[in-house]
């Protein structure tokens, strides 16, 4: 008798689900890592600053939508935002970029489209939720918040200067940065896939049914889960789609919108660079908007 034959059927089922999710997600994580590495090497805050509109509202919308052209995983987005702020990119441009770049970039949008059975519904609603949060945060920072959002005694950011490298050296650096990011994201992906497979196999259906019967509770539960799992945005859609039958559309939408904006690893990085008062207000605004938005989507659908 082989080892696999001696295992309970539930373990084999959970293992099969785990592998199916991770195999689907890995190509997107790999592509996202390479693109993120290219941005690290070739795109500088100075280049971004030259394209900023003159008026404040224009800069808010610029920050909200520029993530489509410059995709960045949330795993390393906070140091990038700090770098933007150091180069005098306004907070009402940098923070909207923080919340939308990991969601509205083409890799994540296509991953979401693929994970949800080639359907545009989740793709559009996820992107709309991110843009809504970014716009409100931008307006808050541009017209309500006074002063800087950075800490005075913030962690010094070590800036890599790739400008002096040759073309071949830059390409090599792209892959070095990509490998670092791939393995950094991979560990969170493994835990997320493991959790999703365990939920589907071992959590009794009656418990999941009772939770999904109370939409607000299900939304809050998956928002907390997304915060704790700290998944990368290139892979979270595959975890979310596996939870769809257990929790419903609106809770999974909240899981996908809030995760790239607010999770454990991002919060820890924010504490190194940003004021505590701003972090609390950021958390409050993001949580309330995602909660209300997801609930209203659930009511209307």
Regions found by a protein language model. Name each.
Residues 1-34, 46, 50, 124-223, ...:
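Selected transmembrane alpha-helices and immediately adjacent juxtamembrane segments
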Residues 24-25, 63-68, 228:
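Interfacial helix-start motif at the membrane-water boundary
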Residues 35, 40, 70, 79, ...:
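Short, flexible micro-motifs
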Residues 70-128, 203-274, 278:
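Membrane-interfacial helix-loop connectors
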Residues 24, 28-31, 40, 44-45, ...:
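Short helix-loop boundary/capping segments at the starts of domains
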Residues 35-66, 208-213, 239-240:
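Membrane-embedded helical hairpins/re-entrant loop segments and their flanking transmembrane helices
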Residues 38-43, 202, 264-265:
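Structural signal for the C-terminal ends of transmembrane alpha-helices
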């Amino acid at each position: 008798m082989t080892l696999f034959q001696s295992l309970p059927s539930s373990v084999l089922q959970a293992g099969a689900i785990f592998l199916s999710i991770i195999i689907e997600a890995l190509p997107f994580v790999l592509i996202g890592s390479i693109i993120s590495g290219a941005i690290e090497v070739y795109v500088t805050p100075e280049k971004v600053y030259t394209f900023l509109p003159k008026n404040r509202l224009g800069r808010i919308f610029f920050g909200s939508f520029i993530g489509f052209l410059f995709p960045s995983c949330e795993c390393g987005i906070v140091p990038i935002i700090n770098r933007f702020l150091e180069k005098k990119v306004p907070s009402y441009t940098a923070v909207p970029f923080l919340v939308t770049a990991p969601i509205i970039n083409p890799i994540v949008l296509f991953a979401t489209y693929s994970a949800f059975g080639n359907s545009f519904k989740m793709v559009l609603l996820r992107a709309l939720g991110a843009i809504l949060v970014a716009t409100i945060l931008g307006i808050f920072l541009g017209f309500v918040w006074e002063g800087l959002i950075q800490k005075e005694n913030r962690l010094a950011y070590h800036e890599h200067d790739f400008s002096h490298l040759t073309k071949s050296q830059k390409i090599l650096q792209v892959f070095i940065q990509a490998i670092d990011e791939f393995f950094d994201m991979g560990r969170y992906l493994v835990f997320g896939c493991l959790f999703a497979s365990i939920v589907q196999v071992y959590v009794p259906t009656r418990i999941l049914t009772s939770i999904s019967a109370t939409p607000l509770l299900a939304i809050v539960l998956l928002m907390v889960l997304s915060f704790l799992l700290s998944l990368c945005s290139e892979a979270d859609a595959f975890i979310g789609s596996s939870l769809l039958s257990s929790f419903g559309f609106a809770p999974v939408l909240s899981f996908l919108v809030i995760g790239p904006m607010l999770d454990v690893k991002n919060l820890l990085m924010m504490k190194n660079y940003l004021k505590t008062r701003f972090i609390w207000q950021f958390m409050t605004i993001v949580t309330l908007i995602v909660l209300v938005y997801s609930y209203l989507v659930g009511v209307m659908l």
